[in-house]
């Protein structure tokens, strides 16, 4: 056997794991193979414990695949492998350079906006060059959305048209819109890409009507290469705007021009929007963005800290991520607060320091999400009684909500499995563990369970 064994394992793990997980937990490991023992060296105890807890089965399975009957013993250590200590050069995940900002001519207002008529339309891109695919942290919660957005950026008008992204506030929908815009313009510098909030479309239409320039308005919006509209739910109950957008939508699709829309809810759940529009929203691909799971939350914090040239210990990132779960914006806001406090006081960023810097935020979070609150919310959602969740009844109409509530308690609180089991009628920790695994499996297999979980997370985190 040679060290290429670990290289083979790395190649398979890179294929099997999300890119952020692989870069954060697996790539930093150094390997040494001798005397039928494969030693894996982690940069610190936190990474070692995490890898051993989360990926040991994956690694052992690969060793069995590659080695057959001559499987080496696996050993974990903290530090660098002996040969590397003299020239310590830790391996880190390579990050592609961000897309270079596209040179654009100075934006000019369309003629309905009270400026003199122009011989050619000038497009307000509004795309933020800072939001790219390279600095979007990928995880299970947003993997499909990012992949779809990437395909649209590479092949606008041809792949997934329209693309409809939906999910709660602060989960990365707007970032992906800008990333698509930047991706399209990186490939074609003169592409006519327009990003806007849905309210801006309404405002532009009102101005066009006031200035007797509705034909100019139509020509502008129907001649773009890509139209990216955020928060489409704000079209609700605006009948004239919906009418105009309906015709704009049809014109763009007929011209193979790309449309990307975002909303805080599934298209058919948007109240106050015409059925014919909601139907069209689903013509292409509709993708949910879920609240980030723990590993992704940790990766987001580490990446944000790195962008600010701040050394954030892994155990501190884990501490914050375990307690703030609702969205990316909340995570980044908390980290900014920690960094500011550290800069003002000159103190090192430790768990105790974070407890102090975020004490009001952490106290509020713990107060808002309790097992009692979860039980009441789940019972109301499934139209059963809290007493049913605590009972011994095993019918599916009760057992499934009970499993859902247990899984949410594990996700949203800091209680141990035995504590959660005790709160559900004195059940043991193995019952809770089975419930969590069952819901995780069903979220992969059942759209309804996935929607239920997302809706309940959104309700409990808001």
From Swiss-Prot:
| Domain of life (superkingdom) | Bacteria
Keyword vocabulary terms for this entry = ATP-binding, Cytoplasm, DNA replication, DNA-binding, Lipid-binding, Nucleotide-binding
What domain notes does the record hold? Domain I is involved in oligomerization and binding regulators, domain II is flexibile and of varying length in different bacteria, domain III forms the AAA+ region, while domain IV binds dsDNA.
Give yes or no: UniProt keyword Amino-acid biosynthesis.
no
Q: What is this protein called?
A: Chromosomal replication initiator protein DnaA
User: Which residues hold ATP?
Assistant: 170, 172-174
Q: Where is the composition biased (Polar residues)?
A: 112-125
- The UniProt annotation puts the region (Domain III, AAA+ region) at 126-342
Subunit-structure text: Oligomerizes as a right-handed, spiral filament on DNA at oriC.
Chain intervals for the UniProt region annotation (Disordered): 104-125
The cross-references to InterPro entries, in alphabetical order and at most eight, read: AAA+_ATPase, Chromosome_initiator_DnaA, Chromosome_initiator_DnaA-like, Chromosome_initiator_DnaA_CS, DnaA_C, DnaA_dom, DnaA_N_dom, DnaA_N_sf
> Record's Gene Ontology CC terms?
cytoplasm; plasma membrane
Q: What subcellular locations does the record give?
A: Cytoplasm
Region annotation Domain I, interacts with DnaA modulators: residue ranges? 1-83
For this chain, the family text in UniProt reads: Belongs to the DnaA family.
The cross-references to SUPFAM superfamilies, in alphabetical order and at most eight, read: P-loop containing nucleoside triphosphate hydrolases, TrpR-like
Query: Region entry Domain II: which residue ranges?
Result: 83-125
Q: Which residues form the signal peptide?
A: none
What are its GO biological-process terms? DNA replication; DNA replication initiation; regulation of DNA replication
**Molecular function GO labels:** ATP binding; ATP hydrolysis activity; DNA replication origin binding; lipid binding
Which residues lie within the region annotated Domain IV, binds dsDNA? 343-462
Describe the function of this protein. Plays an essential role in the initiation and regulation of chromosomal replication. ATP-DnaA binds to the origin of replication (oriC) to initiate formation of the DNA replication initiation complex once per cell cycle. Binds the DnaA box (a 9 base pair repeat at the origin) and separates the double-stranded (ds)DNA. Forms a right-handed helical filament on oriC DNA; dsDNA binds to the exterior of the filament while single-stranded (ss)DNA is stabiized in the filament's interior.
């Amino acid at each position: 056997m040679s060290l290429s064994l670990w290289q083979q394992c790395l190649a398979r793990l890179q294929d099997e794991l999300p890119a952020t997980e692989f870069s954060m937990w697996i790539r930093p490991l150094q390997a040494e193979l001798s005397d039928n023992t494969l030693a894996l060296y982690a940069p610190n105890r936190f990474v070692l414990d995490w890898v051993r807890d989360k990926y040991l089965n994956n690694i052992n399975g690969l060793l069995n695949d590659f080695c057959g009957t001559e499987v080496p013993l696996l050993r974990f250590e903290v530090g660098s492998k002996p040969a590397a200590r003299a020239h310590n050069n830790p391996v880190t995940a390579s990050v592609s350079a961000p897309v270079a900002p596209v040179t654009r001519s100075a934006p000019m207002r369309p003629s309905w906006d009270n400026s003199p008529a122009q011989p050619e339309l000038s497009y307000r891109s509004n795309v933020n060059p800072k939001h790219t695919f390279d600095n979007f942290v990928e995880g299970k919660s947003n993997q499909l959305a990012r992949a779809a957005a990437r395909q649209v950026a590479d092949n606008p008008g041809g792949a997934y048209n329209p693309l409809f992204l939906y999910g709660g506030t602060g989960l990365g929908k707007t970032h992906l819109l800008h990333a698509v815009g930047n991706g399209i313009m990186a490939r074609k510098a003169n592409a006519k890409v327009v990003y806007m909030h849905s309210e801006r479309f309404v405002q532009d239409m009102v101005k066009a009507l006031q200035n007797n320039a509705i034909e100019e308005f139509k020509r502008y919006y129907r001649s773009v290469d890509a139209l990216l509209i955020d928060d489409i739910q704000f079209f609700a109950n605006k009948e004239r705007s919906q009418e105009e957008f309906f015709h704009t939508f049809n014109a763009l699709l007929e011209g193979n021009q790309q449309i990307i829309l975002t909303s805080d809810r599934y298209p058919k759940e948007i109240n106050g929007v015409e059925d014919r529009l909601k139907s069209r929203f689903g013509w292409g691909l509709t993708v949910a963005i879920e609240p980030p799971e723990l590993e992704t939350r940790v990766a987001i914090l580490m990446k944000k800290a790195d962008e600010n040239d701040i050394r954030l210990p892994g155990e501190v990132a884990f501490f914050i991520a375990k307690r703030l779960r609702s969205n990316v914006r909340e995570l980044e806001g908390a980290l900014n607060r920690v960094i500011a406090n550290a800069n003002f006081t000159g103190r090192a960023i430790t768990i105790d320091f974070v407890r102090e810097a975020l004490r009001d935020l952490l106290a509020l979070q713990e107060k808002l999400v309790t097992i009692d609150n979860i039980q009441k919310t789940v019972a109301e959602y499934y139209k059963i009684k809290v007493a049913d969740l605590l009972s011994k009844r095993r019918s599916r109409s009760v057992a499934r909500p009970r499993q859902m509530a247990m899984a949410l308690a594990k996700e949203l609180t800091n209680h141990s499995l035995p504590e959660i089991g005790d709160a559900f009628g004195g059940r043991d920790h193995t019952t809770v563990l089975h419930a969590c695994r069952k819901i995780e499996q069903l979220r992969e297999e059942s759209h309804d369970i996935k929607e239920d979980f997302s809706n309940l997370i959104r309700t409990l985190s808001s």
